[in-house]
UniProtKB/Swiss-Prot annotation:
SUPFAM superfamilies on file: Cyclin-like (SSF47954)
Protein name: Cyclin L homolog cyl-1
One MF annotation (Gene Ontology) recorded for this entry: cyclin-dependent protein serine/threonine kinase regulator activity
Function field: Involved in pre-mRNA splicing. Functions in association with cyclin-dependent kinases (CDKs). Involved in induction of expression of heat shock protein hsp-16.2 in response to heat shock. Plays a role in male tail development, perhaps acting together with cell cycle regulators cdc-25.2, cdk-1, cyb-3, and cyd-1.
Gene null: resulting phenotype: RNAi-mediated knockdown causes abnormal male tail morphology.
Keyword set, alphabetical order: Cyclin
Keyword hit for Transcription: no
Biological process according to GO: nematode male tail tip morphogenesis; regulation of transcription by RNA polymerase II
Top-level taxon of the source organism: Eukaryota
Pfam families with a match to the protein in the record: Cyclin_N (PF00134)
Ranges of biased composition (kind: Polar residues): 45-58
Coiled coil: none
Record organism: Caenorhabditis elegans
GO cellular component: nucleus
Amino acid sequence: MASFVEMRKLAEAKVQNMIRTIVKPKEQNGNVEPKKEEDEKFESTYKQNENTQITPSSFGKRPLYSKVDINCDKWLMTLDEESRLKIDNPPSLVDGLSKETESELRYLGCELIQQGAILLKLPQTAAATGQILFQRYYYQKSFVRYHFEHAVQACLLLASKIEEEPRRPREVYNVFHRLERLHRLQQSGHDINKETTRGMKPPAVDMNYINTKQHMINSERRILATLGFVVHVKHPHRLIVAYGHTLGITQSRPDILQRSWNYMNDGLRTDIFMRYKPETIACACIFLAARTVENPIALPSTPFHWFEAFDTSDRDVEAIALQLVGLYARRTFPNWPRIKAELDALRSVKDAEMKAVKAKEIAENLAKMAPDGEKSTSTVTIGKDSRKVSPDRKNGTKDRGEADRGKKEKDRHRRRSNDRDGRGDRRDRDKDRGDRRKDEKKDRRKRTRSRSRDRKDKNRNRDVGKRYRKESSTPPRSRR
């Protein structure tokens, strides 16, 4: 087995093509050699292009490539100032959506993912992964620009693949269609029971299904591209059991662990997983469960609070606990039709603004292309917007029109000359006769090829049958 020194030398030899060492002046007999012009040029350009954010490698050398961060902690929205601004002002607010509607949409999307995972018989980890991906995605994109119904189905489909419990798009579509019908029944005041849901059947495979499936696949690709394919999630569920075992409540108080587990799953409807680490969330769930069970207990608080041993502050624990308590203060489920109508109105306004901006840009470009001293006299309508343009704005169109007119004149003169000398009808008759002959030849060739092909197939089948009867060991069937 090679020693550590040999392994290190081998590694240094392998990375020589990928890294560049800093040129240092050599010392000979205490005197420093003067730097060459090439070395000075290389060192100056190297220092200019140096990236101070890249940490040195294990061999004391600096790589030329940048760092690629695939850690899921990069999605904590409280690490830098830019992320804090984004979590306080999501992209949906820029498009005119209110803060209350935006929070209702997040709650509605996560609730649909949770119920869909139950109907698809997915594990709870898959449901948690889908909800966290949904939250991450809509902190980068707007609810107004991208339909949340497509994102919900895409998150379910993607989470099932991540947790190695894949489901087909058809199954996801059936489940979402059923959830939508159940929500309509609930909003209309009907009770959800076997009698009201007996007539619910899976939707037919029609164009609506094909379009929805295509939207689902496109949304899945868009989510992956937006998140940079960093879709793995750290779930705090195992940490709850580990912390409970450390506190000694695993065997004595299983109700606290169950209540903490429930708080963890319900907290997925909020954005606490975008703000805090899993260790902090696990401590907050245990902290809240120990105070809200039937027989509350006091967890260790001297000489310091028990959660400080897990690198968690009391401020974060209290903030998460208050957010979870506020979640249970919600009395009504979000009204899906009302939210959808509000989003459609905002989308129509946004589309009208984009059309107006585009029409203005086109008008400005046409004004620049028009010759000086000429003013536009006609209008061109795009959607509901109109703009004035010059009738002679495109020379290509004008030239093409003149060429068409010239061609028509030539055809008219040719027909007149043929009629005068009496040769027009005869020429047309000869042309038709020639076309018919060509068609007959083509049909004759096709029939000949098909007959020869049928003859070959028939002979081959007869030869195969003879060979089978000859090689078969079964006695021939008697004739009656």
